A protein has these predicted regions:
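A short acidic-Thr-Gly-centered motif at the start of a beta-strand
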Residues: 1, 24, 52-54, 109-120, ...
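N-terminal active-site segment of His-dependent metallophosphoesterases
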Residues: 1-55, 68
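Active-site-proximal beta-strand elements of phosphoester/diester hydrolases
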Residues: 3-10, 123-129, 248-250
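Divalent metal-coordination and catalytic microenvironments
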Residues: 8, 37, 52, 64-65, ...
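Active-site environment of divalent metal-dependent phosphoester hydrolases
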Residues: 10-14, 40-42, 67-72, 132-133, ...
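Short, basic, glycine/proline-bearing loop/turn elements
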Residues: 31-36, 79-87, 198-207
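Active-site neighborhood of divalent metal-dependent phosphoester bond hydrolases
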Residues: 46-50, 54-173
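Acidic, His/Gly-rich catalytic cores of divalent-metal-dependent hydrolytic chemistry
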Residues: 140-277
């Protein structure tokens, strides 16, 4: 049995399928961790989601911002974005089934894994990152509440999530506002200042950091002990590089013409699938 992680498939089905073959993924024995953004912008969102759904008993998923965007388009009449490739999925007879499947998925997932050297290591998976001041217990509690919040009334609460997506302060009295901030933070964060204020609009690379802002993972992450490891996607401009041994970037920009990356968690071995032209 092995645990493999992959990030930001974004509907790049050919590369995803080739990657599963390259790692010899066995759905009866292995586990696949997907760090969000399963769909959108790539050419085969429906086919990708269908494949993941068919092996769902062998998959751990966290939601990403593109997954939320799809849910908002399906449930809350959110307008299409310029580069959306969701029409085939949205018009499919299976759309509601797949939407309900995604609504059940968490924003943060964690599990202990036995490494090849025999040690046990706790892995935490999130799409974009974690606010540095939240403890692991706080993150998992907010994750549970956020799942309940989203699934209870998808139409109303998805609108609230996207309406409040520019709020960047966790010091909010309302629990609903706190949950919408948490959801936006874990699915969108790239950079923040030393106090944890997030600049949600930033999408560039490390050479273009605004003054007094740093990558979120440069701060001491309260949820992460020195023995834990965290895996995330979302930030393609990093090309998977964080310069931190215990924080692993998975998004290597397949949808932008680069590659899809799989990581075997037991020994951190990486498998690369170049974009298929």
């Amino acid at each position: 049995m092995a645990n493999y992680a992959v990030g930001d498939i974004q509907g790049c089905y050919k590369e995803f399928d080739k990657g599963l073959k390259k790692i010899n993924f066995n759905e009866k024995k292995d586990r696949l961790w997907i760090s969000g953004d399963l769909i959108n912008r790539g050419p085969d969102s429906l086919k990708t989601l269908e494949r993941i759904y068919n092996i769902r008993s062998s998959v751990n998923i966290v939601l990403g911002n593109h997954d939320l965007h799809f849910l908002a388009r399906h449930y809350a009449d959110r307008k299409a974005a310029k580069n959306d490739t969701l029409e085939e999925l949205l018009s499919s007879s299976k759309c509601e089934k797949y939407a309900k499947f995604l609504l059940k998925q968490p924003f943060v997932f964690s599990k202990k894994i036995k490494l090849k050297n025999g040690d046990k290591k706790k892995y935490i998976m999130v799409h974009a990152g974690l606010p540095h001041y939240l403890t692991f217990k706080e993150c998992m509690n907010l994750n549970k509440l956020s799942q309940e919040f989203l699934s209870k009334n998808p139409k109303k609460n998805l609108k609230k999530i996207f309406f409040h997506h520019r709020k960047n302060n966790f010091k909010i009295v309302s629990m609903k506002d706190k949950l919408t901030f948490f959801i936006n933070a874990v699915t969108r964060i790239r950079i923040c200042n030393k106090e944890g204020k997030i600049m949600f609009a930033f999408k560039k690379g490390l050479k273009d950091l605004p003054y007094n802002f740093i990558p979120w993972f440069k701060l001491k992450i309260s949820a992460l002990t020195r023995d834990d490891r965290l895996i995330f996607g979302h930030w393609a401009a990093l090309n998977g590089k964080t310069n931190k041994q215990n924080i692993i970037g998975l998004d290597t920009g397949c949808v932008w013409g680069n590659k899809l990356t799989f990581v075997r968690l037991e020994d951190s071995k990486k498998y690369f699938i170049k974009k298929i032209k």
